[in-house]
Design a protein with these regions (language model features):
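Transmembrane helix segments
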Residues: 33-37, 332-368
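Secretory targeting signals
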Residues: 26-79, 146, 150-227, 248-328, ...
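Membrane-helix interface segments
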Residues: 16, 242-243, 331-336
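Long, solvent-exposed extracytoplasmic domains/loops
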Residues: 72-184
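Aromatic- and glycine-rich beta-strand/loop motifs that create alpha-glucan
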Residues: 1-18
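Transmembrane helix boundary and interhelical loop/hinge segments in multi-pass membrane proteins
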Residues: 220-235, 239, 243
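Junction motif at the cytosolic side of a transmembrane helix
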Residues: 5-7, 324-328, 401-423
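Short hydrophobic, aromatic-rich alpha-helical segments embedded in or entering the lipid bilayer
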Residues: 359-383
Length: 423
């Protein structure tokens, strides 16, 4: 315990560590501010002039305008949403074949008359996409029968989409469909919508997770490498507790520091992020806010927590691997370069290899659950599967399973390899 306490103090007295901790804390309010600031709302004032408000004011206007189209979105509300759009389109000569992108539709008319049904109509169009091409019908093409059959069609759309992405019906795509529908059966219907949080907010949770893991990686880089660089490790290893006990203490101290930092920063970020919107919006179904093809039976708030937990598991795996690299490299600079390279490697693989091999490779890497374009956040809202023979494995399962194993593996290897180095 004495050595462990000394290692904690050593880390907290390091200038670079303190700077990185401060950066992690400052990023929380900065990133939490952006999603809400992007929101805009346009209306006509008493003089007939269009006025655009942004940020919190726009969110309040949107919530005020939502009317009956919130709470449980029943078949009656689906029909009412479709009728509202048809009445709106009928007010324009020839209708609106280009939808809201018609040049005759002003921003204020859209916001005040049909923006409150836009998300619902988009999900209806998505559910009735052509199973052979994946192309969704336009809003004008929707029928009352499709509105009343929306919820039963959602399951069929999941099935059609997985077959379309997987190259048709086969034993392995059947396995994927079975897993997806098993999860979708647990989705609460009718879907729930509460004004507030936006899809951008969910993406920012994933972005902040990546930045936290990046910061924690650089915090841990010098744990072993700094002594290797100055050759102080040769002296330390001559002491009675300078090998195994010191290695274990350093590993535990590093993991405790970055783990505590992650939990504190993530809690602060989620609190500030959701406070900038409206906590009521956390009850919205993912299937309405994001896509009907999301088969996770969770609300927006539950997904945010899940992303945070998944990020923590990935952090542990990445931290253990970083400690392993720190003990193997001769300088802090080389350890930093190697750690950063492995952190962004899943993103490189995602862009370079799109097939089944690429999915396996990026998910099995220690940092496979974080990234700007390839993270657990996107995988949890996608229908991507990796295949082993005829067995389908949903990518989030693969990411978290690999991270859990790698955390234990590399934590042990970090201590063993450092102790044996120089023998």
């Amino acid at each position: 315990m004495r050595i462990f306490t000394a290692e904690i103090k050593r880390l907290l007295k390091t200038r670079s560590v303190l700077i990185l901790i401060l950066a992690a804390l400052l990023l929380a309010p900065a990133l939490a501010y952006f999603p809400a600031s992007f929101e805009t709302w346009t209306y006509r004032d008493d003089s007939g002039q269009e006025v655009t408000v942004k940020g919190r004011d726009a969110l309040l206007k949107e919530a005020e305008n939502q009317g009956q189209f919130q709470g449980k979105i029943t078949e009656e509300k689906l029909l009412a949403a479709l009728q509202r759009w048809k009445d709106f389109a009928a007010g324009y000569e020839g209708g609106l074949p280009d939808g809201i992108y018609d040049e005759r539709v002003t921003a204020s008319d859209y916001c005040e008359k049909v923006s409150n049904v836009g998300g619902i109509l988009n999900r209806m169009c998505e559910a009735w996409a052509d199973p052979k091409t994946g192309i969704a019908p336009g809003r004008d093409d929707l029928t009352e029968e499709q509105a009343t059959g929306f919820y039963s069609q959602c399951r069929q759309h999941i099935k059609d989409l997985i077959y379309l992405e997987g190259g048709g019906e086969s034993a392995r795509t059947d396995s994927a469909v079975q897993q997806a529908l098993a999860l979708y059966d647990r989705v609460e219907m009718p879907f729930t919508y509460e004004p507030g949080v936006t899809p951008d907010a969910i993406e920012y949770v994933g972005i902040y997770v990546f930045l936290l893991v990046l910061i924690c990686t650089f915090i841990l880089v010098p744990v072993f490498a700094s002594d290797c660089q100055t050759q102080a490790d040769q002296i330390l290893k001559c002491a009675r507790d300078g090998r195994r006990r010191l290695a274990v203490s350093r590993i535990l101290a590093g993991l405790l520091l970055v783990g505590a930092l992650y939990l504190i920063c993530m809690a602060l970020f989620l609190l500030l992020l959701n406070a900038s919107f409206d906590f009521k919006g956390l009850d919205t179904s993912l299937q309405l806010l994001v896509s009907v093809s999301v088969f996770l039976p969770l609300t927006v708030g539950q997904l945010e927590l899940l992303i945070g937990v998944a990020g923590f598991v990935t952090l542990l795996a990445t931290a253990a691997f970083t400690l392993f690299l720190s003990g193997r490299m001769k300088t802090v600079a080389s350890a930093s370069i190697a750690a950063f390279a492995f952190l962004i490697l899943p993103m490189v693989v995602y862009m370079a290899l799109s097939g089944n091999i690429g999915k396996w490779l990026r998910c099995l890497l220690p940092a496979g659950g974080v990234g700007l374009i390839n993270s657990f956040t996107y995988a949890a809202m996608d229908t991507g599967f990796a295949y082993l023979g005829n067995t389908a494995i949903w990518l989030p399962y693969l990411m978290m399973g690999a991270a859990a194993v790698e955390f234990i593996l590399f934590a042990v290897l970090a201590g063993v390899s450092w102790c044996r180095r120089g023998k």
